[in-house]
């Protein structure tokens, strides 16, 4: 039985409700009062991440987030094909890096999981990938205007956000990344950056953790909106390379990361103080 299925089996035996009861910031207690394992805590974060991305309007009915398996780096975890706001623990599936399901059990899979598998193959430093279609970002994927950091809280987006055009390598398509060949082309365009725009489609964002990827995805969208608004007033003063580096370090610190995660998780409505140890 796959590791994730063994955990979900234990979760069900604990008698928890069908709805996920997400844990507090400490995330040390599992359903039924037992101590959580590292895998359990990561799975909880993945569910919370889906809810946060939906609540913060980074995703709507479409979009997805993945997690490299914390105990099997040659695999990754993500929901079955479902709108992020509705994702629960029972929806989480396990895949190898070629995007084959380990334990499908008849569940429908995201058609663009190749985005995640290809990036995990190319980037050993990446442990989470967010793909979204935030409207604020799209204009920067279809014009020659580069997206650049204008606000300190967007630390981590990097000095360069490349644009990938699927038509360059694959001609006319439906714009979706449907196979690993297309996914690897996208991963090549991403390079060692934190995000890659996808012409007329959206963006893929990477992070060292689920929390890291969510934070960058949210503030990349915010930065795009502010950059667009700022250009209406004239020339824009962007952050310097030094400021970009220092704000990335600040935003990615445990203090800042935990603080914003707790805030977003509570806003999404799926954190319960009753589960605190």
What would you call each of these model-derived segments?
Residues 9, 21-277:
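Glycine-rich flexible loops
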Residues 12:
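Segments surrounding the PLD/"HKD" phosphodiesterase catalytic module and close analogs
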Residues 15-16:
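Compositionally biased, low-complexity intrinsically disordered regions
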């Amino acid at each position: 039985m796959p590791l994730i299925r063994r955990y979900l089996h234990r979760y069900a035996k604990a008698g928890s409700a069908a709805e996920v009861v997400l844990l507090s910031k400490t995330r040390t207690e599992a359903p039924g009062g037992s101590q959580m394992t590292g895998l359990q805590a990561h799975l909880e974060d993945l569910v919370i991440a889906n809810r946060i991305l939906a609540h913060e309007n980074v995703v709507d009915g479409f979009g997805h987030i993945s997690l490299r398996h914390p105990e099997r780096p040659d695999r990754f975890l993500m929901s079955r094909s479902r709108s992020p706001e509705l994702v629960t623990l029972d929806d989480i599936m396990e895949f190898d890096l070629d995007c084959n399901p380990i334990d499908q059990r008849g569940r429908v899979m995201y058609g663009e999981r190749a985005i995640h598998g290809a990036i995990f193959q190319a980037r050993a430093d990446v442990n989470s990938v967010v793909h979204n279609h935030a409207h604020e970002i799209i204009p920067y994927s279809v014009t020659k205007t580069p997206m650049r950091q204008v606000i300190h809280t967007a630390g981590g987006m990097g000095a360069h956000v490349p644009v990938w055009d699927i038509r360059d390598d694959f001609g006319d398509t439906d714009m979706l990344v449907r196979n690993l060949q297309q996914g690897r082309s996208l991963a090549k365009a991403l390079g060692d950056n934190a995000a890659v725009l996808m012409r007329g489609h959206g963006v893929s964002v990477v992070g060292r953790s689920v929390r890291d990827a969510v934070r960058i995805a949210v503030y990349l969208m915010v930065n795009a909106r502010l950059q667009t608004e700022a250009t209406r007033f004239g020339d824009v003063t962007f952050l310097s390379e030094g400021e970009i580096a220092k704000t990335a370090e600040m935003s990615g610190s445990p203090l800042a990361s935990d603080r914003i995660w707790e805030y977003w998780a509570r806003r999404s409505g799926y954190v319960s103080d009753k589960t605190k140890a």
